[in-house]
A protein has these predicted regions:
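Short, ordered, surface-exposed loop/turn motifs in non-cytosolic proteins
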Residues: 1-8, 108-112
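A structural motif detector for short, solvent-exposed N-terminal "entry" segments of globular domains
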Residues: 68-122, 215-234, 238-253, 313-315, ...
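Solvent-exposed beta-edge/loop recognition patches
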Residues: 136-340, 355
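A short, solvent-exposed beta-strand micro-motif common in secreted/extracellular proteins
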Residues: 27-42
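Short strand-edge motifs at loop-to-beta-strand transitions and within beta-strands
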Residues: 21-23, 62-64, 163
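Short beta-strand and strand-turn-strand segments in soluble, beta-rich domains
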Residues: 4-9, 45-50, 129-152
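Structured interaction patches on ligand/partner-binding surfaces of diverse proteins
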Residues: 11, 38-67
């Protein structure tokens, strides 16, 4: 169990016994309490996680109850996410990328996977959306969803391999794009979140060697590529159990202009990561603890930083195993140098264009 005061930087860690943990030496204040553990059962490893935010710990003997959920560890995990962009004077954001890694010992197929940025509140979090759907707590919601192509066996990902989804799979280090300020060349990405070459806001978005994704849901303002918040957001990787409809969207009963979306069953989600704009964002988290019990933040927008998953261990063959406790606060760290395939992640065999 971890008790964190993000205002003071104070962190107290303790262990549980029979589901109960006791902590001493806590200075009165407002804390976030997170719990994480793992358990093996039936040949599978389950992650147990939960959190409570805005917990006032004032008097001795205060008790806090944290609800926890158990989720089977996923084979595919977000390994690194670069969302901040660069150049605050010119707001360069087209170099965003999402690296997804096979953390298991079995081959996994990327065909048909979907990726989305979820919504749960208005911009300043003063309105938490109320969705008029039965069992709303069993869903997360997204305005835009992109899907990988394939027939089910087209894109194998071996253990230790990763694939990269680029917003735009070009060399962003180019002077004519980011004035040389971007840290990444994305020409080796496996997929890009554009459907075809187009011009947007006066910029020619070229169709590159990376495989085009399909925008299967567009419930909000239409853009030809996938831009997520440079302040951080809530990212989900999922495999839909039924076809996604690009119509008949759900609108929150207290919606503003962002409150129309498509529901995603939590049971379909493979991995989720939560990033907030700063420590104050920890007070209102948008993902259920069954998906992510924590969050992380970079030093700001347009600062050229990424978030990367920590290494848990290395297998005898040199393949890395990444930490996955379903708690981004524990599992990720901020990096000043966004990198594709950090720590030696391998390239899928079907990416034949990476060295062209």
């Amino acid at each position: 169990m971890k008790i964190s005061n993000f205002a003071t930087g104070s962190v107290i860690e303790t262990t549980t016994e029979n589901g109960i943990a006791t902590a001493v030496g806590i200075i009165p204040g407002v804390y976030t309490v997170t719990v994480s553990a793992s358990q093996n059962q039936g040949g599978f490893t389950y992650t147990i996680a939960g959190s409570e935010s805005n917990v006032s710990l004032i008097a001795d003997g205060a008790e806090v109850v944290v609800r926890v959920d158990a989720v089977k560890e996923a084979a595919l995990v977000f390994k690194e996410i670069y969302y901040t962009g660069v150049d605050p004077a010119n707001f360069y954001f087209r170099d965003q990328f999402y690296e997804i890694y096979n953390n298991s010992t079995e081959v996994v197929y990327a065909d048909g996977l979907c990726i989305a940025e979820t919504v749960f509140a208005n911009y300043d979090k003063s309105i938490i959306y109320e969705w008029p759907i039965e069992n709303a707590d069993q869903y997360v919601f997204a305005r835009v969803i992109w899907q990988l192509p394939g027939d089910g066996k087209t894109y194998p990902v071996q253990p230790g391999e990763s694939f990269v989804i680029a917003q735009w799979a070009t060399n962003h280090k180019a002077e004519n794009l980011s004035k040389g300020l971007s840290p990444v060349d994305l020409t080796g990405a496996e997929f890009e979140a554009i459907e075809k070459e187009t011009t947007f806001n006066g910029i020619l978005l070229t169709d590159n060697l990376a495989i085009n994704m399909k925008k299967v849901v567009q419930a909000g303002y239409a853009m030809p590529q996938w831009l997520t918040s440079t302040d951080g957001s809530r990212y989900v990787l999922f495999k839909p159990s039924k076809p996604l409809k690009n119509e008949d969207f759900i609108t929150a009963t207290n919606a503003d202009y962002q409150g129309t979306a498509r529901e995603i069953a939590i049971s379909d989600v493979i991995d989720a990561v939560q990033a907030v704009n700063n420590e104050s964002g920890m007070s209102v988290l948008g993902l259920p603890t069954a998906l992510d019990a924590g969050a992380i933040w970079c030093s700001g927008a347009y600062v050229g930083e990424s978030i990367a998953r920590k290494i848990k261990e290395t297998r005898p063959d040199g393949t890395k195993v990444y930490q996955d406790t379903n708690n981004t606060s524990n599992d990720f760290e901020v990096k000043k140098d966004p990198q594709l395939r950090r720590y030696g992640a391998k390239v899928p065999s079907w990416n034949t264009w990476i060295n062209k």
